[in-house]
């Protein structure tokens, strides 16, 4: 108490967690290890905004962004960016990009109604495609949803699909191979091919995913929940094996780990090597294959990518059995993609190097065999 003061000083510190819990009793699921920064939004009085003069927090956060950008950081992944007012990003990101034009900003935004706001007003380069493509592919891989849902998923983005970041694992989500997801990393291969190859946008791989990391350790706080802990000091089995005591030669990996890694390596390499994936147009074939007599729209998904005289015919199979499918290629696909119609095309499966003959005609189905939990990327040049 200040000397001579009539009343003792009573302090009433702000009690706010990062997830907007405004009391002193957060529960175990609240972000009690975080604090809420003051970006100029009065959350306790209707969320009113006070952005003039520029909040001091904005200035400090811009300084932090510029500091790390000056150290050579090539991008920022902004956790739960939608919990920070879009006005801040609108103000800060252009200033960082003015000094560092090549830097990327990726936002974790889970509300589709806010996607365009954070892309076009907030100036983010990419947004997490979690509640759309990730959730859909996970449900399809687990048998809870039809593969036809993938079409509705990309259509719902209505033109911003190139600005979405695709992924199948991240620090928040359960591992594909865990008992809480697919229980087998091979079941994620069709989803990998779709997620990586259906558009020109980026694909994120979470460490250990390429080896089929189980995420089934019983860590301290995190517990056995199918995730790799972000709360405990821990190490990851497949990464330890890959490191091999600092040799980084992968010799401790199992043959199953190595096989899966080779698939991931091949698919991701194709994303950069194949111009049809990196720059080409996309055509979804599913609408022409509903209720197909030799095509299960619930277990298979098929589409095309094309650039100039190169065509990729991509088919994936989420089923546990090898399938012989007959795929209808509609006349509109030939017109839109400008594909010459031919009875016999020599095609190369870019995943295996195997060659096969296929027909591409609007009145005759294209016959292809696809293995269980697998896919084909057939390349045709004309």
Language-model region placement:
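Active-site groove signature of glycoside hydrolases
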Residues: 61-86, 166
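Noncatalytic carbohydrate-binding groove/subsite architecture in carbohydrate-active enzymes
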Residues: 113-203
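Aromatic- and acidic-residue-enriched segments that line the glycan-binding/catalytic groove
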Residues: 1-29, 120-127, 215-232
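Substrate-binding/active-site clefts of carbohydrate-active enzymes
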Residues: 1-67, 92
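The substrate-binding groove and active-site-proximal loops of carbohydrate-active enzymes
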Residues: 33-57, 73-83, 137-141, 174-183, ...
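Substrate-binding cleft/loops of secretory-pathway carbohydrate-active enzymes
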Residues: 86-98, 109-141, 214-222
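C-terminal beta-strand-rich structural cap/linker in extracellular carbohydrate-active enzymes
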Residues: 358-382
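Loop/helix patches that line or flank the sugar-binding groove of alpha-linked glycan CAZymes
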Residues: 161, 170, 175-345
